Amino acid sequence: MAIRRLTEKLHISWLVAAWCLGLTVGVIAVHHLPRSVEFNMLALFGGIILFVPVLVWRWRALLIVAVISGGLVGLWRGELGRAGLEVYDLLIGKTAVIQGRVLEDPDIDKKGQTVLRLSDLRINGEKLAGQLWVVTADKRPIKRSDIIQAQGKLTAGFGAFSASMYRAKIGIVERPVPGDVAVGVRDWFAERVRKHIPESESALGLGFLLGLRRAMPTELSDNLKIAGLTHIVVASGYNLTILVRLARRLFAKRSKYLAMLSAATMILGFMAVTGLSPSMSRAGLVAGLSLAAWYYGRTIHPLVLLPVSAAITLLVNPQFGWGDLGWQLSFASFTGVIILAPLLHKYFFGDKEPGTFRQILIETLSAQIVTLPLLMMSFDVVSNVALIANMLILPFVPLAMLLTFASGVLAVVPMIGAAIALPTTWLLSYMIQAANWLASLEWAQMEVNITWWQCGLMYAAMIGAMWWMKKQTKLDLIQVNIVE
């Protein structure tokens, strides 16, 4: 009986998921292993050879072989990803002039300094691997995709950044022609929104709709962090999911093809406007895979979707897996929404369909539970008002996005633009006041410090709890689809 179960054939998706899980672990593990060019090629060939019997026989017993195969290929890809990074060992601690392309929209830190993320690096005309974190007091209007020259002392990097440069002096700033067209369209639209809506309110609305962060007042940005609301004003899976669901539902009854095309256009357009940050890369990939499955009448199990999407993002950029907190939090919150949330609802409410309020409550709570250990380990602080803040604000985010969009589109139409801007301002003002009030409470946040092994224990407990709820409810998670 045991042998029959071990030789039972599985659907190919489970074997691919196991392989992707191994690849993810392999890429992450490379960062903690010594470099070895000889082993690198052996790992690639070994991984390919091991996966052949997995594809041929598809036995349950071969799941572990699939994981090992993926792990070996992951080691190979991770080693390729850190090729050339050894040069930073010679550069750290020295003053250097580095040219690079601005990868994401610039941020403003608590001191009012500009934070830049550079890729396509060059030093003395030679290509330099990796990405650079730059902090500067320069106030010039630098945009995504600009080519800049930064001079300063290099210090050790963190996460996906190979090195950091603080108090950098910015020299040449070049804007390619035509440059990043999506940024130009976005900035043009943002100006239309600001025509009739006050600064703070327009900044919040544009944060919802376009992921714009730089224009947001520092005080409002800090209060949103304290209230646990940062995720709604950066380009995230939540904002993208709202847009994709809207596009699909508008056309689904008329034409499935038109619904798919409009939703896919929304995904590509939103990613072009907001940029390919780690969290946005994950969100776009997951939304695209889920949309394709819906269009072809298929379903993807969350336990397949998670490792597959993680592996694809790491194949594209293995540095995401080397301590990039945005990448980690993105997958943690996604796990909460597509696995923990359905289990909690089934466990406590049975087969009763969730209303909007209950769905938001459970999904928000689930995302916060799964991201909590990472947040405590990384920031040593926890928001005590996050759940309240999300319940007060999250239900109105889709309406705020719609009104902000309408305000921008109709801004040039006399009277109508101002008429649309009025309720938009009222709604956004309510959200700002709610966030400010919650952030002002003495008990709004507390300091908590945990170690990596305590973080691991917390996640082990979560996995155990989810396994228990799955066993008790017998919920089939394959029914979950984020685009429906």
Regions found by a protein language model. Give the residues of each.
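Aromatic-rich juxtamembrane segments at the membrane interface
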Residues: A2-S13, L21, A160-V286, L291-A292, ...
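Divalent metal-coordination and catalytic microenvironments
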Residues: G26, G100, G152, F208, ...
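N-terminal leader/targeting segments
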Residues: M1-E86, S162-Y166, R282
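Alpha-helical transmembrane signal-anchor/signal-peptide segments
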Residues: E79-Q99
